């Protein structure tokens, strides 16, 4: 087998052989997770996206549109208005202070234990979702579904806010706190503990293990290799580096940067993300607003194209349904609402009241999808690059849209992409680590083993061309939604 592999590699190249072998072995899993349910003769939608949107709609109605009614409260919690309620000397106050306030027994057990503030938990979770999906994914949606896909992305983002509220509230409610104050939380724990309370301990344990396995796979793939790969491609393209060891060198540098942050644990990750996330989102939005401002006469027509295209699209496969599918699909892939990953980061917050962190998590899909994705869409629609039949797709289309306004703007976008990739990687390293420790035990040896392996995958991702590996890792991330 080794000789045959070497022979094939010599003929086709190592990347191509790995891609082919891996695709043959995992294709069935990818097809299962992303199997499409036909909506019309021309258009289908992955069943996992239907599931995510279905539960998001259910939670939105069940919690009486808390995504809207709780929005101002979320802003107040993040800026620290209610921090005195979490103070250890505040005691247990009477009444339902937040929607779904915690039970006194849990409050007494938890106290104010936790590792990070509300704002740090939000930025840590945001850094895992605000990434290439906001830049490349939006471009893909508009290329296929036209400007109208933007409206359906926004609606899906608003619905996803309630899914985040539910999973992040549970993440805090059922977390474990170690003797040294380290927090262990996420779907692994609320599936195991919550279902055990309801007489389904066996089912809860199985679902928790499945989630942990999928999460580890997603952390190495979509949360790591894909990010380093795309960051390396756009950096080398912008810098003019081609061939040779450019990808390997970029991967090593990125791995060193990632390793430096993740070795310090969640507190260092949160300390980095609370500075990097506002900076990178701010830089990206500022650059986008400059492009929009330079074409301000096209703003109103652009909104007209988005509105009209959402209900009466022209030249889009599947018509109205085709546009709706593209918008919903890209929103689900971007904000990961219902996947469960964010609950791991939010579970480490310093609070007595689980629902207070659930309220904070409402902001995550709003910033990710409603704000960042919408601004990206406006840049693409206003500049009109998507109309060129021979135009690039994905991140390159967005880059071209920026370049059409100011030639050197792709350099700004390159910096934003690298920061997006970096922040996504450090957050997903934490998600994967929590799942790793859940499966293999909480020891320093297991912690270091995971972190070293994670950094090796960073180098690997930047060094090879990804195909089937990317498909599989994406499938692993969305497979997390099934047990969750």
Question: What residues fall within each predicted segment?
Answer:
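N-terminal alpha-helical transmembrane segments of multi-pass membrane transport
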Residues: 1-128, 143-149, 160
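Extracellular/periplasmic helix-exit of transmembrane alpha-helices
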Residues: 8, 12, 167-180, 287-305, ...
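Extracellular loop-to-transmembrane helix junctions
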Residues: 41-70, 143-182, 368-375, 474-483
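Membrane-interface loop-to-helix entry segments
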Residues: 52, 59, 63-76, 207, ...
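Helix-loop-helix module between adjacent transmembrane segments
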Residues: 59-60, 126-127, 156-181, 192-229, ...
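Flexible loop linkers connecting adjacent transmembrane helices
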Residues: 66-118, 140-142, 146-150, 162-202, ...
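Alpha-helical membrane segments and immediately flanking helix-loop junctions
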Residues: 91-142, 170-173, 179-195, 216, ...
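Membrane-embedded translocation segments of transport machinery
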Residues: 258-274, 279-347, 351-352, 364, ...
């Amino acid at each position: 087998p080794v000789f045959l592999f070497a022979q094939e590699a010599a003929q086709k190249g190592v990347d191509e052989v790995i891609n082919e072998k891996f695709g043959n072995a995992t294709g069935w899993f990818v097809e299962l997770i992303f199997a499409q349910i036909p909506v019309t003769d021309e258009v289908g939608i992955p069943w996992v996206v239907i599931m995510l949107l279905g539960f998001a709609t259910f939670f939105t109605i069940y919690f009486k549109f808390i995504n809207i009614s709780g929005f101002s409260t979320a802003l107040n919690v993040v800026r620290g208005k209610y921090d005195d309620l979490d103070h250890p000397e505040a005691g247990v106050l009477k009444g339902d202070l937040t929607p779904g306030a915690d039970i006194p027994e849990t409050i007494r057990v938890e106290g104010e234990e936790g590792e990070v503030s509300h704002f740090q938990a939000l930025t840590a979770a945001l850094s895992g979702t605000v990434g290439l999906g906001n830049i490349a994914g939006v471009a893909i949606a508009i290329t296929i579904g036209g400007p109208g896909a933007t409206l359906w992305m926004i609606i899906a983002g608003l619905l996803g806010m309630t899914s985040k509220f539910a999973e992040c509230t549970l993440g805090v409610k059922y977390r474990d706190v170690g003797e040294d104050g380290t927090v262990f939380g996420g779907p692994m724990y609320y599936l195991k503990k919550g279902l055990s309370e309801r007489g389904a301990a066996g089912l809860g344990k199985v679902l928790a293990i499945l989630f942990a396995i999928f999460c580890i796979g997603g952390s190495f793939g979509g949360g790591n290799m894909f990010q380093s790969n795309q960051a390396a491609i756009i950096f080398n393209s912008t810098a003019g580096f081609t061939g040779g060891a450019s990808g390997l060198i970029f991967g090593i540098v990125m791995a060193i940067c990632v390793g430096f942050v993740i070795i310090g644990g969640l507190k260092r990750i949160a300390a980095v993300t609370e500075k990097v996330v506002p900076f990178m989102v701010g830089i990206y939005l500022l650059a986008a607003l400059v492009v929009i401002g330079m074409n301000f006469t096209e703003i109103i027509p652009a909104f007209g194209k988005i509105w009209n295209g959402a209900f009466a699209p022209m030249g889009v496969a599947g018509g109205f349904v085709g546009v709706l599918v593209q918008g919903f699909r890209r929103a689900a892939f971007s904000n990961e609402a219902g996947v469960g990953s964010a609950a791991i980061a939010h579970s480490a917050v310093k609070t007595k009241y689980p629902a207070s962190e659930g309220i904070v998590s409402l902001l995550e899909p709003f910033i990710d999808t409603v704000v960042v994705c919408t601004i990206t869409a406006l840049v693409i629609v206003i500049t009109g690059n998507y109309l060129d039949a021979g135009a690039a797709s994905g991140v390159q289309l967005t880059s071209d849209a920026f370049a059409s306004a100011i030639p050197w703007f792709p350099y700004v976008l390159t910096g934003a992409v690298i920061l997006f990739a970096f922040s996504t990687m450090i957050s997903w390293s934490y998600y994967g680590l929590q799942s790793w420790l859940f499966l293999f035990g909480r020891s320093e040896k297991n912690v270091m083993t995971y972190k070293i392996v994670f950094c090796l995958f960073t180098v690997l991702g930047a060094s090879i061309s990804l195909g089937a590996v990317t498909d599989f890792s994406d499938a692993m991330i969305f497979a997390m939604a099934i047990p969750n």
